[in-house]
Amino acid sequence: MITPQQPSGMPIEKYRPFPAVALPDRTWPNATITEAPRWCSVDLRDGNQALIDPMTPSRKMQLFELLVAMGYKEIEVGFPAASQTDFDFVRQLIEDDLIPDDVTIQVLTQAREELIERTVTSLVGSDRALIHLYNSTSTLQRRVVFGLDRAGVTDIAVQGARWCAQYAEKLLEGTDVRWQYSPESFTGTELDYALEVCEAVMDVWAPTPDNPVVLNLPATVEMSTPNVYADQIEWMSRNLTRRDAVVLSLHPHNDRGCAVAAAELGVMAGADRVEGCLFGNGERTGNVCLVTLGMNLFSQGIDPMIDLSDIDGVRRTVEYCNQLPVHPRHPYGGDLVYTAFSGSHQDAIKKGFEAMERTGQTLWEVPYLPIDPKDVGRSYEAVIRVNSQSGKGGVAYLMKSEYALDLPRRLQIEFSGVVQKHTDDAGGEVTAGQLWEIFTREYRPEGGDPAASLELLGSRTTAASGARDEVTVSVRLDGTETVITGSGNGPIDAFVAALSERGVPVRVLDYNEHALGSGADARAAAYLEVAVGETVLWGVGIDPNIVTASLRAVVSAVNRASRES
C-alpha cells in the first residue's frame, strides 16, 4: 500500500483560489492555431528593466539589430521618459536612420503629462511609431497603491490618452502614429471594469478598422491557470464594441511557469498579437519566451514568421546583451535539449534516424526529438551522449555517426558493457573521443598492442584445389616471430585452422564486414564473434584490405580472450 501524503504545514490560509470566469459557452477549447500571431519583442524595455545590470547602449543596439535580423516587425525600444539612456537610444535609432521601413518601434509611457510629452518628443522625426500608454487597473492596486475607485482610475487612463493625442498632434507631424493601451495587472482587474476602461480609452483615440488600436491585456503577474486567462481573453474579445478596430494583444508573465501555455490558449481565445522576450527574460520569472512560442508553431508545421535557424547564434547574442545565461534545459535553445543520455531513449533515436534514412521520408519522425536539430543550426553530434545511464543504442549511434563503425547487435551489447564499467569506475560523461579510446584500447582493431599474445605481421592468401584457400601468416606468438600456415573455406577459416595447430583453439560464430567510406582508398571493418576455448567474445579489425581486416579481427578476439583468462 502506498503511504498517504501528509499535510505540509505551510501557511495555506494566507492564500485563496483565483476565481473562475463564468463562460459556459467558451469556444477556445475547440480552436486551433493555424498561423503565427503578430509578435512584439519587449526585450529592450521589459527585459532590460529586469536585468541586474541594464544593457549599455552598444548592447541595446546589438540586440535591436538581432531582433530586426530575426524578422520582428514591432519592437518596444524603451521607456524614453524613464531615463536619459532610453531617450538617447530612441533618438539614435531615428537620427541615424537605423529603423527599417517595415519595422515599427514602440515606446512605453505612464499616464502622466510630463512623461507623455517627453515620450512623444523622443519620437520626433520618426516615420512610424506606436505609443504604448498604461496604467494599473487591478482591484489590489486601486486600493493599496492609488486609493482610487474605478472612476478615478478611468480618469487617469482617459486623461493620459488625451495627452498622448494632443502631444502627438503637436510634435509628430508626418509620423504614422499608432496607439496601444494596457490596463496593467489586467488579470487582477474585474472583467467588466477592464472592458469599461478600454472602451473609455478607445473613445478618445477613435480607432477604425484601417487604423486600429492595440489593446494589450497583460498577465502582469501570472495569477491563475492558463485556461482562466484564455477565458478572460475570450470574454474581452466577445464584449469589445469595436472589435474590428482592435488588435487584441497578450503580455503573459511566467510567475506560475505557464506563460507559454497562457499565450497559446490566449491566441486560441481570439488574441491577435503577443508581446514577450527572447528566452523568457523579464521581471521576476520573466516574460513569455518568444523563442519557445515560435518554435512550438514551427514544430506543428506552422511558419513562425521569425527566423530561428541559427538558434545558438541568437542565444549567444541574448546572453551577451543580458549578461544572463540561458538554462541548458531551456526549450529548443538550451545546450542539452536535443541530448539523450538514457539508454532506451538513445536506442529509439538511433532506430528513428535509421528508419528515416532507409525510407527517405522528409516528414520528421524520430522518437524523443520533436524537431530536427539541424533546422535550428544544431548538429547531430550532441544528440546522443554517453554516461552511466546509457545503453547499447547510444554507444552504437556514436560509433556509427562519429567513426562509421556499424557494430553488430551482439557487439553493441558487449561493448556497452565495457563502456558501462568505465563510467561506473570513472563517473561522468564519455565523449565521442573518449569512446574511441575505450574501443581501441579494448579491441585494438589495427593492432599495436605491445603486450599482446598474438600479433599479425603479414599474410599471403592463395586459392588451392577444391576451392579451399591457403594462408601463410607471419605472426608474433607469445613473443616469438613465426610463420604459420593453414587451409580452409576462405582466409578466416584457414587462419583459424593454422592457429588451432599452434594450440590456440578458435571457433568462428558470426562474421560481419563493411566499408568505411567509399573510393579506392576506403578502409574496411571486420567484426568476428568467436569462441576461444570456453570464452565467447568479439574481435574487430580495420585495414584497407578486407582479408587483412578479417585476420586482424581474429587476432583482436584471441588477445581479448588471453587478457580475460
From Swiss-Prot:
CC annotations in GO: cytoplasm
A Pfam family it matches: HMGL-like
Location within or outside the cell: Cytoplasm
Catalytic activity: 3-methyl-2-oxobutanoate + acetyl-CoA + H2O = (2S)-2-isopropylmalate + CoA + H(+)
Residue ranges, annotated region (Regulatory domain): 446-565
A biological process term (GO) from this entry: L-leucine biosynthetic process
Keyword entries, A-Z: Amino-acid biosynthesis, Branched-chain amino acid biosynthesis, Cytoplasm, Leucine biosynthesis, Magnesium, Metal-binding, Transferase
Keyword set includes Zinc-finger: no
This enzyme's EC code(s): 2.3.3.13
Sequence ranges assigned to domain Pyruvate carboxyltransferase in this UniProt record: 37-312
Subunit composition and interactions: Homodimer.
Similarity annotation: Belongs to the alpha-IPM synthase/homocitrate synthase family. LeuA type 2 subfamily.
HAMAP family registered for this protein in UniProt: LeuA_type2
Entry protein name: 2-isopropylmalate synthase
